[in-house]
From Swiss-Prot:
One of its GO terms (molecular function) is RNA binding. The keyword Ribosomal protein applies. Disulfide bonds: none annotated. InterPro entries: Ribosomal_Su5_D2-typ_SF, Ribosomal_uS9, Ribosomal_uS9_bac/plastid, Ribosomal_uS9_CS, Ribsml_uS5_D2-typ_fold_subgr. Residues 135-154 have a biased composition (Basic residues). Residues 1-33, 115-154 are annotated as: Disordered. Keywords: Ribonucleoprotein, Ribosomal protein. One of its GO terms (cellular component) is cytoplasm. Belongs to the universal ribosomal protein uS9 family. GO terms for biological process: translation. This is Small ribosomal subunit protein uS9. It comes from Tropheryma whipplei (strain Twist). The keyword Ribonucleoprotein applies. It comes from the Bacteria.
Length: 154
């Protein structure tokens, strides 16, 4: 028996995204992210895409759209944005450091859930690397970490 021919532009049986080739989401995971002086504990569970940060909605917690996008990048590149419920507990730091900590925590949680499919794209995007840059301390005799007071020759 000969299988029926498909039209060239018919993609009904072809997977549309990486999420469809993965199968059903059944596993949960957690990850710890740090950036500057911020620490984020991230818990992922299969769900409708509810994103809660310290008991508040992400839109309420991160008022800047840039910080929200930055925090959600790992889910976006894996095409899992509405697939997991995300619960985050944040401590310390400012908005930028906290967004970076959430991003690292989500990436590590996704890596623990499915390392075979998730590790390579997360690693190539640089989401599994901890950004170790921190503020340099102020030194005695200087105005800031490296800024010296104005010098007068005479």
């Amino acid at each position: 028996m000969v299988p029926p021919q498909r039209a060239k532009n018919d993609t009904s049986s072809a997977p549309d995204s990486a999420a469809e080739t993965r199968g059903p989401l059944v596993s949960s995971g957690s990850g710890l992210g740090r950036r500057k002086s911020a620490t984020a504990r991230v818990y992922l569970s299969p769900g409708e895409g509810v994103f809660v940060v310290n008991g508040r909605d992400i839109n309420e917690y991160f008022t800047s759209k840039l910080h929200r996008q930055f925090a959600c990048q790992p889910l976006k590149i894996l095409d899992l944005l509405g697939s997991y419920d995300v619960k985050v507990t944040l401590h310390g730091g400012g908005a930028s450091g906290q967004a970076g900590a959430v991003r690292l925590g989500i990436a590590r949680a996704l890596n623990t859930i499915d390392p075979e499919n998730n590790r390579k794209p997360l690693k190539s995007a640089g989401f599994l690397t901890r950004d170790s840059r921190v503020k340099e301390r102020k030194k005695a005799g200087l105005k800031k970490a490296r800024k010296a007071p104005q010098y007068s020759k005479r």
